Swiss-Prot record:
Chlorophyll b 5 binds at residues 161, 258. InterPro entries: Chloro_AB-bd_pln, Chloroa_b-bind. This is Chlorophyll a-b binding protein 1, chloroplastic. It comes from Zea mays. Chlorophyll a 1 binds at residues 76, 82, 95, 215. Chlorophyll a 3 binds at residues 133, 143, 210. SUPFAM superfamilies: Chlorophyll a-b binding protein. The gene is CAB1.
Length: 262
């Protein structure tokens, strides 16, 4: 068995299915799904040692393990969360996935309220109140139209979400009948029907744009949560109130409501 082993370069063959010759009657198949990203264009301002830093020219020297190899690396890690390579890889995946969910969630929080304020009838357009409509006598009608999806069972909705989301996540990680997945973070193939990742340089820049917008969306969702708790209103209604009376409708004014004695 020792004579049959071979040295495999993870950088040269990352993401490539590898078959190693038979050992007796068995066969070993290995598929490395997470490897180093393709090197971006040398002139890109987002990668490499001369990339944009979190404080621009005042950033100082970044940690040695933040080399500008991955998208969204601004050389800032004061807590040392990326020092361990395995933890870094896990956190990268968590950030990308949470960014995508946050972008979808932020759109889902704002868009129904926007439609409602422009004449589209909803049972409840405010994002943190909409789900409770399923417990009402008439149930929950998507877009206020009973001919689309008329939901009356929270268990049925939960089951549908588990099946649909589980199937997509399973394919993203392990592949499926539509093709193999080389990188579970950027599976491509059926997940990229427009071929946006065909050009490596454009793809490298899109990764950065995705993370920048995703980080903004995560902060936005946090703001929506706080607004819902403090004001009991949706994001657009809060925005309209602030524009109408910025002196009395702002974060500082609401924060003083929680000061002892008020």
């Amino acid at each position: 068995m020792a004579a049959s082993t071979m040295a495999i370069s993870s950088t040269a063959m990352a993401g490539t299915p590898i078959k190693v010759g038979s050992f007796g009657e068995g066969r070993i198949t290995m598929r490395k799904t997470v490897g180093k990203p393709k090197v971006a264009a040398s002139g890109s301002p987002w990668y490499g040692p001369d990339r944009v830093k979190y404080l621009g020219p005042f950033s100082g020297e970044p940690p040695s393990y933040l080399t500008g190899e991955f998208p969204g690396d601004y050389g800032w890690d004061t807590a040392g969360l990326s020092a361990d390579p395995e933890t870094f890889a896990k956190n990268r995946e968590l950030e990308v996935i949470h960014s995508r969910w946050a972008m979808l969630g932020a759109l889902g929080c704002v868009f129904p309220e926007l439609l409602s304020r422009n004449g589209v009838k909803f049972g409840e357009a405010v994002w943190f109140k909409a789900g409770s409509q399923i417990f009402s006598e008439g149930g929950l009608d998507y877009l206020g139209n009973p001919s689309l999806i008329h939901a009356q069972s929270i268990l049925a909705i939960w089951a549908c979400q588990v099946v649909l989301m589980g199937a997509v996540e399973g394919y993203r990680i392990a592949g499926g009948p539509l093709g193999e997945v080389v990188d579970p973070l950027y599976p491509g193939g059926s997940f990229d029907p427009l071929g946006l990742a065909d050009d490596p340089e454009a793809f490298a820049e899109l990764k950065v744009k995705e993370l920048k917008n995703g980080r903004l969306a995560m902060f936005s969702m946090f703001g929506f949560f706080v607004q819902a708790i403090v004001t009991g209103k949706g994001p657009l209604e809060n925005l309209a109130d602030h524009i109408a009376d910025p002196v009395n409708n702002n974060a500082w004014a609401y924060a003083t409501n929680f000061v002892p004695g008020n």
